[in-house]
């Protein structure tokens, strides 16, 4: 049987979402608290349909069938952080770096974020923390990664990597059909 490109990609993505199970709010309350703390938000998901799943080596929290949180490896161990869809849904005001227009095509292909492209960053950001990268002009999220330097250092860099990218618009997690 032949599928069009979109249908075949959808089937492949659905097969990679593993161990998907509904969970009660009380069983993931601590995860939700840590997820909110990571970006300075107080998340209230008590009325939402919550699921846990596994996708390409990462544990996910699905809220109303949309992957909004992921468990990732950082310099300090493992941490919960919003996915790009989570950033769009919750609009956090912490842990961000803003890039100029020239960096966008590279980030959309999964490249690490270079310091020269970062013009603004959250000053409270420390090396080793998770960071979401946004478009300087529109504020739209583009990628999520681990900061290699502090927020102040990012804005002063003229060369070298500032963020190691983990998840970006267009990757398999972004394209995941749930």
Feature roles, as predicted:
Residues 2-58, 62-119, 124-127, 133-178:
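Beta-strand/loop-dominated core regions that host nucleotide or nucleotide-derived cofactor-binding catalytic loops
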């Amino acid at each position: 049987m032949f599928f069009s490109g979109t249908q075949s990609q959808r089937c492949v993505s659905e097969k990679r979402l593993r161990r998907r199970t509904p969970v009660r709010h009380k069983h993931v309350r601590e995860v939700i608290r840590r997820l909110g703390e990571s970006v300075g938000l107080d998340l209230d998901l008590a009325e939402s349909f919550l699921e846990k799943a596994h996708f390409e080596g990462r544990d996910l929290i699905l809220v109303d069938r949309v992957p909004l949180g992921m468990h990732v490896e950082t310099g300090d161990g493992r941490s919960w952080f919003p996915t790009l869809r989570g950033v769009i849904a919750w609009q956090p005001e912490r842990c961000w770096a803003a890039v100029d227009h020239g960096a966008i095509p590279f980030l959309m292909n999964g490249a690490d974020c270079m310091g020269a492209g970062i013009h603004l960053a959250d000053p409270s950001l420390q090396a080793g923390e998770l960071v979401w990268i946004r478009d300087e002009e529109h504020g739209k999220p583009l990628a999520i990664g681990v900061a290699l330097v502090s927020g102040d250092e990012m804005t002063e860099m003229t060369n070298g990597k500032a963020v190691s990218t983990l998840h970006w618009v267009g990757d398999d997690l972004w394209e995941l059909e749930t």
